[in-house]
């Protein structure tokens, strides 16, 4: 909505009505109250005077995207993450579908990493996960400059909607059923392995895990790498700074301020390298924070 290059024409949510949409957009526990106008007019959601058609279909095949002229659909339900399931949007007139999550079979692309491999013949693609979008650009910079022999990643991840406020049943992930408040919860993540899909040279060289923590927003990637070429930590910082100011500008950002997590709320960068938080054991072994 804030990007003049993108025109939001419609949304689909089968679980809430228009009045509730207005309320949820106007008031946000993380980002605060929306400073513009939000209203209902002629059966549409109107934000800052911009009308948005609202569909309420559970089956994406029934959403008439073509009727409003929508070419691109962002599939962000977390449910329809395979090519077959996400392709249902095409039946309603959409031309392309971007899955905002990892996919078992859709081609995966991370901005700043492998978009050059995109082919216009693709109708359904995956934009990977938030963690992969943070990790992959950093891994690319380090691998291109120094080479990565192997690495381990931890993501200290903010609370997500699937977690529980109090202990409850979670048959697939027992720890995931524990109360989010007051707990640090170890969890699995495929983000590090997914980097191997977008950077083939790193396939099999990275793996990782997640810790869910009781914060509302902002997560951090902790990447420990063994380097092929010796490098001081200052040389590593310089490589990231040059990428942030050059080819990956707007994708990677660089800070040497003494920041904490809430300082990043609202950031549009995929990955913000915290130069002051990283450490190094020797010239081939370092921990990087982004």
Curated annotation (Swiss-Prot):
Its EC number is 1.2.1.12. D-glyceraldehyde 3-phosphate binds at residues 129-131, 160, 189-190, 212. CDD domains: GAPDH_I_C (cd18126), GAPDH_I_N (cd05214). It catalyses: D-glyceraldehyde 3-phosphate + phosphate + NAD(+) = (2R)-3-phospho-glyceroyl phosphate + NADH + H(+). The active site is at residue 130. The keyword Oxidoreductase applies. One of its GO terms (molecular function) is glyceraldehyde-3-phosphate dehydrogenase (NAD+) (phosphorylating) activity. The record marks 157 as: Activates thiol group during catalysis. NAD(+) binds at residues 13, 58. GO terms for cellular component: cytosol. It comes from the Eukaryota. Transmembrane segments: none annotated. It is found in: Cytoplasm. SUPFAM superfamilies: Glyceraldehyde-3-phosphate dehydrogenase-like, C-terminal domain, NAD(P)-binding Rossmann-fold domains. InterPro entries: GlycerAld/Erythrose_P_DH, GlycerAld_3-P_DH_AS, GlycerAld_3-P_DH_cat, GlycerAld_3-P_DH_NAD(P)-bd, NAD(P)-bd_dom_sf. Belongs to the glyceraldehyde-3-phosphate dehydrogenase family. This is Glyceraldehyde-3-phosphate dehydrogenase. It comes from Lactarius deterrimus (False saffron milkcap).
